[in-house]
Curated annotation (Swiss-Prot):
It comes from Corynebacterium glutamicum (strain R). GO terms for biological process: leucyl-tRNA aminoacylation. GO terms for cellular component: cytosol. The keyword Ligase applies. The gene is leuS. This is Leucine--tRNA ligase.
């Protein structure tokens, strides 16, 4: 990369990269030494020492915090960080108390894998990575309150992660009140009989162990022997979101198998309705709201009970009106009744060969089929183009018509949605139609309007062939009426019930790793789980010699998890007094998933050094509490602006909302939601290059010749991609800062385009941002002598128009995060001043400019502010205001068309009448040349736009 000043003799006081680096270092030190960006709290150790009241007007702006990777930052990472810094700086100038800081989401698999490879403790690697990232971010001049920075790996942070886990563990969800309540309030309800145990047993007749189990069944955190994604190659289970569409681990690309294991789960499904309904309260993009709605997947319909060999198989359907068209049933291969029904299954004698998958018996067919789908992800199973399944050897009774319908298992039905069983209506469902066609099953029309000989008819229509002799006749009814009448009949006959189902599953909350938050849970000799008291927090990670979970052959689906913490026997086996004397206990050897710390970190930013509470509610109320007078009567509260990538829409953001709602229910926070406003920034893209094998090669080493691209002499293919390590096209911000200056990088990234769109990086274009800053510098500083070039002089009317229009536009753009157009307006104003004042310049024209520039280019603004005689930082200088009178023109210029072609331009008073405009147009010399000797047929004035003359 070449220095733009290279090859010339720089003037002594020119704004060069060297001078920029010097200025930037000095001002960054000044900000640090003076705590320039420190935001005071109402109470606690961050409250004003003099007891001074805080401004009512505040702003809490937050970035999705980074994972401290060993590779450090590339220029794509700071895009959102710079934008939030610009927004925060602007709002400080509006007089707001602004909280803006940045922490580190530092637990996770990369540091652990590096530790496994090198023997280096993950904490050592993580802290080194954090220090490197701090250095890189510090060089950008970000105005963070460094006192509030946190790292999820700090025991003083994860102490409170564990504490929040225990709040959730020690709570239950009251479905009637639709909120979490302490477990202590559950037990009296069970004792009085007001609430039943989950299995219907008499609570008071139970023994101590059974009573504890009855209570545990209600907890928001529970252990479940459920189907999980087991990855032998990583030695851990994965959440659905960590498995790719082709059934492999997102990290490492290992096969993932479905396996039944006992795991910690969080009952996020209890909050499904609130998670959907409260989206309406949030200032989020419709795209993200839609993603969350779809992920939660609320469906209204009915549960219908089918009888099969003495067992009741319950299915969920959104179309109970199509029950008469159900010609077979399908269970998920993992459904709990599959093995029960197999014991009652008949033989395959006389069964259609297409139903048996080439096996001799139902038991053999099921075993073979389960093995064949073990490595498929849920997504892959649902999207599988080829429909497969096997007959269970039993039949179920259709409750509306008594038909005996065959029962199958098939991979397109999942245990994770509905009941794990479906009634198949092939005439009106595409997947059922494909399955029925492949296996030769009957297809019965029950909704009029299509041609089921050709395809399933999935639109609405009148019900047909839908009546029985037992009081149900929906023939001729439209969908909604038919659905309602069918549900009414099912409930009357006790064969079903109207209900709501969700796609959302409970949150798998355990990982078989080392580098994560330990669980504050121990087990007694009977295997009963006990929550540790607050006084025993944090439960710190022990030192271990081997960080590796017991990983297995990636293809070994039968392997069992063995976490690395299980090897630390002195830590695992403990003697504790939990209130009933010292006893022996065993610690839980799993760790929390990487989402735990990020599910609440915004609250620790509010009160980062509080030893007594995770967050004092008075501080929380000030920074994130509802403000109906500002945001409307339904304001849920939360962080004022949260900026990050849309890829976190259904993971981090959903989990954070869940945790926050529990904390709200328990009275620990005043805000209903963690993030009032969400803004998704785009990505910085860059050219990437692949060789003939499709392998990415280092972009820095690619050469261009005659429009083609070569790497080590071999021609390579050029493509655009998201900048990053995997595409080998990363550009380090360190290089740009060193060669151009941090302010230049900031201006360039902000000017590249709208913040919410992706944009291409081009290092060769960075010099344009530097030239703008050099022109700004030259307005104030003589490049030869270093003298200040301002003078006291009244601004002209043109100056005032340019200045006030710039102020008005820039204020609006800063407010709405349109920083690219802020830069455009500032460039336009600098160009005007450069042209108008080639020597010295009125101070009144340039002082407001420096203030307007400072949010986006703070270092040069501070330096110029100082040169113009100010002792204090520009950070808290009031942002310029504008006068309306300068925003309107006294005169306007109008094009004059003759027979539709522009032939001249006239200048008239802004309030000129149509007659005056026509008079001026006819008097214009160029127009007269076009109309001379011709008849004027028509004259049209479009106010403020144009004049059109028609001649013949």
């Amino acid at each position: 990369m070449t220095n733009p000043s290279e090859g010339t003799t720089p003037l002594a006081f020119r704004y060069t990269p060297e001078l920029a680096n010097k200025i930037e270092g000095e001002w960054q030190n000044y900000w640090t030494d003076n705590g320039t960006f420190n935001a005071p709290n109402p109470v606690g150790d961050l409250a004003p020492a003099d007891g001074k009241a805080l401004p009512e007007d505040k702003l809490f702006v937050q970035d999705m915090f980074p994972y401290p990777s060993g590779a450090g930052l590339h220029v794509g990472h700071p895009l959102g960080y710079i934008a939030t810094d610009v927004f925060a700086r602007y709002n400080r100038m509006l007089g707001k108390n602004v909280l803006h800081t940045l922490g580190y989401d530092a637990f996770g698999l990369p540091a652990e894998q590096y530790a496994i490879q090198t023997g280096t403790h993950p904490r050592t690697t993580t802290m080194a990575n954090i220090e490197n990232m701090k250095r890189q971010l510090g060089a950008l001049g970000l105005g963070h309150d460094s006192r509030r920075a946190v790292a999820t790996t700090d025991p003083e942070f994860y102490k409170w992660t564990q504490w929040i886990f225990l709040q959730i563990f020690n709570s239950w969800f009251d479905a009637e009140q639709q909120k979490a309540r302490p477990i202590s309030e559950l037990i009296p309800l069970l004792e009085s009989g007001e609430l039943k145990t989950k299995d219907g047993a008499d609570y008071n007749a139970l023994g101590d162990v059974e009573k504890q189990k009855a209570v545990d069944d209600y907890r928001l955190v529970y252990r479940s022997n459920s189907t999980v994604n087991w990855c032998p190659g990583l030695g851990t289970v994965l959440a659905n979101e960590e498995v790719t569409a082709d059934g492999r681990s997102e990290r490492g690309n290992f096969p993932v198998f479905r396996k039944n294991l006992s795991q910690w789960m969080m009952r996020i499904t209890a909050y499904s309705d609130r998670l959907i309904d409260d989206l309406e309260l949030l200032d989020w993009t419709e795209k993200v709201k839609s993603m969350q709605r779809n992920w939660i997947g609320r469906s209204r319909g009915a549960e219908v009970d089918f009888s099969a060999e003495g067992e009741t198989v319950t299915v969920f359907t959104t179309r109970p009106d199509t029950l008469f068209g159900a010609t077979y049933m399908v269970l998920a291969p993992e459904h709990e009744l599959v093995d029960v029904l197999l014991e009652k299954a008949g033989s395959y004698e006389g069964v259609d060969a297409r139903w048996t998958n080439g096996q001799a018996s139902p038991a053999e067919a099921v075993a073979a089929y389960r093995a064949s789908i073990a490595a498929k992800s849920d997504l892959e199973r649902q999207e599988n183009k080829e429909k497969t399944g096997v007959f269970l050897g039993v039949y179920a009774t259709n409750p509306v018509n008594g038909d005996q319908i065959p029962v199958f298992i098939a991979d397109y039905v999942l245990t994770g949605y509905g009941t794990g069983a479906i009634m198949a209506v092939p005439a009106h469902d595409e997947r059922d139609y494909e399955f029925a066609t492949v296996l030769g099953l009957p297809i019965k029309e029950v909704v009029a309007g299509g041609n089921i000989e050709e395809a399933a008819f999935t639109e609405s229509g009148e019900a047909v062939n839908s009546a029985n002799d037992n009081g149900l006749d929906i023939n001729g009814l439209a969908k909604d009426e038919a659905v309602a009448k069918t549900i009414e009949w099912l409930e009357e006959k006790e064969l079903g019930r109207g209900t709501i189902q969700y796609k959302l599953r409970d949150w798998l909350f355990a990982r078989q790793r080392y580098w994560g938050e330990p669980f504050p849970i121990v087990y007694d000799e009977n295997g009963q789980a006990h929550a540790l008291p607050d006084s025993m927090l944090p439960v710190e990670l022990p030192e271990v010699e081997d960080y590796k979970p017991v990983s297995f052959d990636p293809e070994d689906a039968d392997s069992e998890p063995s976490p690395p913490l299980a090897k630390a026997r002195e830590w695992v086996e403990v003697e504790l007094d939990l209130g009933d004397g010292k006893k022996k206990y065993t610690r839980d050897t799993n760790v929390m998933p990487q989402w735990a710390g990020s599910s609440w970190y915004q609250l620790r930013y509010v009160d980062p050094s509080n030893d007594e509470q995770f967050c004092n509610i008075e501080n929380e109320r000030y920074w994130t509490g509802p403000r109906p007078e500002t945001h409307g009567p339904n304001d849920p509260g939360g962080v004022d602006l949260y900026v990050g990538g849309v890829e976190h829409a259904v993971l981090h953001l959903l989990y954070a909302r869940f945790w926050h709602k529990v904390l709200f229910d328990l009275g620990h926070v005043s805000s209903k939601e963690p993030y009032r406003r969400l803004y998704n920034q785009g990505y910085i893209q860059a050219f990437a290059y692949t060789d003939s094998r499709g392998v990415y090669v280092p972009a820095d080493d690619v050469e261009e010749k005659d429009g083609k691209f070569f790497y080590q002499g071999e021609e390579v293919n050029q493509e655009y991609g998201k900048m990053g390590k995997s595409l080998k096209n990363a550009v380090a911000p360190d290089d740009i800062c060193n060669n151009f200056g941090a302010d230049t990088l900031r201006v360039y990234e902000m000017a590249m385009g709208p913040l919410d769109t992706s944009r291409p990086w081009a290092t060769k274009d960075v010099v344009g941002a530097q030239r703008f800053l050099q022109r700004l510098w030259r307005l104030v500083v003589d490049e030869n002598t270093g003298e200040v070039l301002t003078r006291d002089e009244v601004l002209t009317d043109d100056d005032n128009k340019q200045l006030h229009r710039t102020i008005a536009g820039v204020r609006d753009d800063y407010t709405n995060l349109r920083v690219n157009t802020v830069v455009a307006k500032l460039i336009e104003y600098v160009n005007y001043l450069t042209k108008t004042y080639p020597d010295t310049i009125p101070a009144g024209a340039v002082l407001p400019l420096i203030v307007m520039v400072s949010p986006v280019a703070p270092h040069i603004a501070e330096e110029l502010w100082k040169k113009l005689g100010h002792d204090d930082t520009v950070t808290y200088e009031p942002f310029p205001t504008f006068e309306e009178k300068w925003l309107t023109d006294d005169e306007i210029e109008l094009p004059v068309q003759v027979n539709g072609k522009v032939r001249g331009r006239i200048t008239v008073a802004a309030d000129a009448s149509q007659e005056q405009v026509i008079e001026a147009a006819l008097a214009d010399e160029k127009v007269q040349e076009q109309i001379s000797g011709k008849n004027l047929i028509k004259q049209i004035v479009v106010p403020g736009r144009m004049v059109n003359l028609v001649v013949k």
